[in-house]
Amino acid sequence: MDLLFLFFSLLLSYLFFKIWKLIDSKQDKDCYILDYQCHKPTDDRMVSTQFSGEIIYRNQNLGLTEYKFLLKAIVSSGIGEQTYAPRLVFEGREERPSLQDGISEMEEFYVDSIGKLLERNQISPKDIDILVVNVSMLSSTPSLASRIINHYKMRDDVKVFNLTGMGCSASLISVDIVKNIFKSYANKLALVATSESLSPNWYSGNNRSMILANCLFRSGGCAILLTNKRSLRKKAMFKLKCMVRTHHGAREESYNCCIQAEDEQGRVGFYLGKNLPKAATRAFVENLKVITPKILPVTELIRFMLKLLIKKIKIRQNPSKGSTNLPPGTPLKAGINFKTGIEHFCIHTGGKAVIDGIGHSLDLNEYDIEPARMTLHRFGNTSASSLWYVLAYMEAKKRLKRGDRVFMISFGAGFKCNSCVWEVVRDLTGGESKGNVWNHCIDDYPPKSILNPYLEKFGWIQDEDPDTFKVPDAFM
């Protein structure tokens, strides 16, 4: 009897040990954001309303028709007059970009952001175990990742990934790479650098679908420190809860809706097709189908299913009520309350229409979409790094409290929709905001005035006649 008791005691002890080891090992696989640093270019790269006019008027390929189109586009874009452009635009060389222009633009970003991030956290570049760099429209040899390693003299065994061509959703792809590495390697520190090089891709032709990108995309970038070190968990800002990636590259319509291309004159630019909203909506819906059960409580999912069931029964009884009679392109509401599982919504700043569309679909109010709106207004569409400017706005406004969940939603060429949820590890209301990119202007947002500076300065163009129009002397 004593032997039997001893046997079962040992067996139970072994089982408890295995369970403890399993739980303990999972803790080492968690992905935390330790800190992040958004890039604020120097003020001499700020695109004022006046300078926007100078850029447009010196393009000899444009006429009054294109001016009217651009005015309408920039007014409806939601962008303000304090965004940043590449340095070569201010030097008047946008028609003759060089490889060095693109590299210099990226060097200015990573020297600033990575340098500040490592210094603030008292981390040596040699402590970095994993480096992931994503810049879609610049591919150099050696890679940008290699240039960062060379500049900061990182270790020989650092694991390196250099992503190109992944579009505006690339930063979450970079985070996903880090997350998967953390599953296999414990006690690691990762650095993600996300940006976009606009210098080689500033379009100087007159194709409307390509010149539209000049109105939306602006310079920016972000460096993010991630870790699965147990000793750093209490210092972390966010913990990754889940991530879902959707790729519709197999669909021709989605694949071709936004693409880097040449126009008929051979000028390189970024094409934004009219079917882009449709492709984005389709990818977003597919993504939501997968991530929703992962992030919302069971009670809300049951309520939603019952609501759908009742609706289907009513439609069967009266088919005429099943028609929505909505105009084409109108975003549909998901019909589910995402606020039951999410406190904050970090939306990609692809444009005013993108933000409004997601806000409508998820039934968000003005408070929810304010961070994305203000980021678009202040910094423009900074491509893959835009999500982090939105997150920084929330932090600067002291919205992020311990236990809150942040839903990140991004879109990118391919066509891709990537989303993830972060849990706030501790109240973010104090010293961690020292390097926040919004610190210098957060009290000015939201702005009291809603007047559009572009409409005020260039609204007269709409009344001009092609036969009598003349470029004002102020822009010659």
From Swiss-Prot:
What pathway is this protein a component of?
A: Lipid metabolism; fatty acid biosynthesis
InterPro entries assigned to the protein according to its UniProt record, in alphabetical order: 3-ktacl-CoA_syn, ACP_syn_III_C, FAE1_typ3_polyketide_synth, Thiolase-like
Q: Which residues form the signal peptide?
A: 1-25
**EC class of the enzyme, as a word:** transferase
Primary subcellular site in the record, as a coarse category? endoplasmic reticulum
Quote the Pfam families the UniProt record gives.
ACP_syn_III_C (PF08541), FAE1_CUT1_RppA (PF08392)
Q: Which GO terms describe its molecular function?
A: fatty acid elongase activity
Induction trigger: Repressed by herbicides such as flufenacet and benfuresate. Up-regulated by osmotic stress and down-regulated by low temperature, salt and drought.
Compartmental location = Endoplasmic reticulum
Cellular component per GO? endoplasmic reticulum; membrane
Q: Which GO terms describe its biological process?
A: fatty acid biosynthetic process
- The record places domain FAE at 26-313
Summed up, the tissue specificity of this protein is: Expressed in siliques, flowers and leaves.
Its Enzyme Commission number(s) read 2.3.1.199
- UniProtKB keywords: Acyltransferase, Endoplasmic reticulum, Signal, Transferase
Gene name in the database record: KCS12
Which family does the record claim for this protein? Answer: Belongs to the thiolase-like superfamily. Chalcone/stilbene synthases family.
Q: What is this protein called?
A: 3-ketoacyl-CoA synthase 12
The reaction(s) catalysed by this protein are: a very-long-chain acyl-CoA + malonyl-CoA + H(+) = a very-long-chain 3-oxoacyl-CoA + CO2 + CoA
Active-site feature positions: 168, 247, 344, 348, 377, 381
